[in-house]
Amino acid sequence: MAFLKAEAMVVDGKQVFVRADGRFSIDGESFPIEKTLQRNLADNANNIPIVNFLLTSFPLARDHYLIKLQQFVNGMLWFRSLGFNEFIGLETGGTALEEYIIKNKLIDDFRRFLYNVSGQEFEFATPGTGEKMLLCIIGKRRVPFMGIWSSGTQALELLYFWMQRMGRATFVFIDEFDAFYHFKLAFEVCKILFNKDCQVFTSSHNTYLMTNDLLRPDCNFILNENKIKPLVDCTDKELRFGHNIEKMFRGNAFKV
């Protein structure tokens, strides 16, 4: 079982609270707490996060920074598709992707998405009453979509599902997002994701994506041996829009 060893919050350079090594202090003007309770929070035997305690114990204005923090955290999402689908955040339970597409009358939109991003054309059958699985028409046969898709198309279905949810997201991290994509498809997916109205992080081994056509160098990060640094902090060279960032990377111009 995990335990919080230390917590601290600083807002605009002002310390709100700090709890560490059995000690606790808080901005008493913003959050007046009696001494006995402060001692209990210092010990915190039941492992209650201080932020959660403040959110549930004090009436706060709608624009209070703790409310904004809570809204941001509640809008965070992590997902990936590496053989099977996984996610954390934004939703409380699993959803059958194809049932969702059918129920929300998104079949034609999903078909257009697949064509626009990957060039693939599918003819989906009109679902019958109670059908929860997408069926493709091949010749005169109705074939389950999942029976003919590639791993990349399967990953695109998951991406499409979460894109319908990203209007409520604040921060999205897609782990190994292009594990089953070819280079051009990964590039097209990035163009869509990076135009969303939320913060999006993707992880990849594809250096083809290290280009100013997608992101500025300060928005590209290198992860190596538990360290993460933006490209601009990995070199003394001046980085300009016309530079071939991938070529520089392959030439060992960046050091973490």
Question: Model-predicted segments: where are they?
Answer:
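Short polybasic amphipathic segments
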Residues: 2-10, 22-24, 130-139, 219-222
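Electropositive, glycine-dotted interaction segments
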Residues: 2-122
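Acidic, Mg2+-coordinating catalytic modules of nucleic-acid enzymes
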Residues: 105-112, 118-128, 237-256
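Secondary-structure transition/turn motif
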Residues: 8-13, 29-30, 136-141, 231-235
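A short, sequence-level motif marking secondary-structure junctions
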Residues: 21-25, 146-152, 233-238
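Substrate-recognition/cap regions that form aromatic- and gly/pro-loop-enriched pockets
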Residues: 160-164, 169-171, 179-201, 205
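C-terminal lobe/lid and adjacent interdomain/linker elements of RecA-like ASCE P-loop ATPase modules
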Residues: 187-256
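Conserved ABC ATPase signature
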Residues: 127-164, 171, 176-183
